């Protein structure tokens, strides 16, 4: 019997092992995917290193030097004796910071440094993850800051669009441009949230590299371009209205639609073709390629044009204020106010702060400032151009007052009806059931008249 049970156990053991392995894979699919990605990166780097070692010319300079080598993670060139070679940390592991440095020492004898404990050649990777915890915390803070910013932007922009569409008296060309700009902000915010939560952080999706992932990246880049080109449309409209022709007739909005929604398709399509041919990485998610300038170049050009429009508009405003002979302080305050209102709409802050500073604290401050400027721009624009708009405030105030008056009248009317009905009902009940009344007439009306009044109480107000 025992032998029989042992045979059953041996027969079922492989199935139990399969179940355990499958359960482990279901519990930690991301770990297995990350391990596969890391292994592929290391194998690719190793292959490229050996190719480089064989193809590079032999060192011709005199003197002692350490030979080129592969240390298991990185490739090292020939180095003169007594020097220290340095390069950036690899991105194989999640806790490695590619901005930190790896060092490898070549001693005076032309041998790579050996660790005293293991007596093996050793490369110093200790700096790669020394500040990982702090940087991960900063990255998480920026991630949550981004999600909250886009969420608030979507909510405020949808409310603004609802106001613009509901109140027909606000309809004009300027509001039409605002509607399209706000809608582009909404689309861009929604796609950005999906990209950050469902694509960028989904290693399984990136590893499988479906076509839908690349299509989504194409849509993401296209909508980002639409966002900035609708900013350009706002700048062109304001410049035409204030500088070119103040008393001109209505402008043709068809060209604005083409520029805002149509033109961004051109760089987006060119980038997609170039990415497919020259840098076809998974989901086109990598930013380590100059092909992104196909998208960023037109955006920077649009922002520079908007910067010119802004400066010219401020110049015209200052000139007009000087003609009115107002006080100097008031003149500059109005010019500054106009500038501060235009800056968030036209996106000039990306031109004013284009360079990332060096230094840990400076970089962190820069990241927070840029994340606020970029991801809260929809909230800022909707606040300034809708909620702080005098016309919008006047219409909302007028409708709110009308609603309060109507609600108050309705409430007072219903209270009066209930009070009158209660009074008349009491009188009717007394007349019908009391034997103490000297006459069947009350207040000049008969009991039958009172019954009619109870049935039709609105007659009290005739």
From Swiss-Prot:
It comes from the Eukaryota. Glycans are attached at residues 67, 119, 124. The record marks 287, 296, 355 as: Required for ADM2 interaction. Residues 289-290 are annotated as: Required for RAMP3 interaction. It holds the Pfam family HRM. Disulfide bonds join 49-75, 66-106, 89-128. The keyword Phosphoprotein applies. Residues 23-140, 200-210, 275-290, 353-367 are extracellular. The modification Phosphoserine is found at residues 421, 446. It is found in: Cell membrane. InterPro entries: GPCR_2, GPCR_2-like_7TM, GPCR_2_calcitonin_rcpt_fam, GPCR_2_CGRP1_rcpt, GPCR_2_extracell_dom_sf, GPCR_2_extracellular_dom, GPCR_2_secretin-like, GPCR_2_secretin-like_CS. Keywords: Cell membrane, Disulfide bond, G-protein coupled receptor, Glycoprotein, Membrane, Phosphoprotein, Receptor, Signal, Transducer, Transmembrane, Transmembrane helix. It is a multi-pass membrane protein. GO terms for biological process: adenylate cyclase-activating G protein-coupled receptor signaling pathway; adrenomedullin receptor signaling pathway; angiogenesis; calcitonin gene-related peptide receptor signaling pathway; cell surface receptor signaling pathway. Coiled coil: none annotated. PANTHER family: CALCITONIN GENE-RELATED PEPTIDE TYPE 1 RECEPTOR (PTHR45620:SF21), PDF RECEPTOR-LIKE PROTEIN-RELATED (PTHR45620). G protein-coupled receptor which specificity is determined by its interaction with receptor-activity-modifying proteins (RAMPs). Together with RAMP1, form the receptor complex for calcitonin-gene-related peptides CALCA/CGRP1 and CALCB/CGRP2. Together with RAMP2 or RAMP3, function as receptor complexes for adrenomedullin (ADM and ADM2). Ligand binding causes a conformation change that triggers signaling via guanine nucleotide-binding proteins (G proteins) and modulates the activity of downstream effectors. Activates cAMP-dependent pathway. This is Calcitonin gene-related peptide type 1 receptor. It comes from Sus scrofa (Pig).
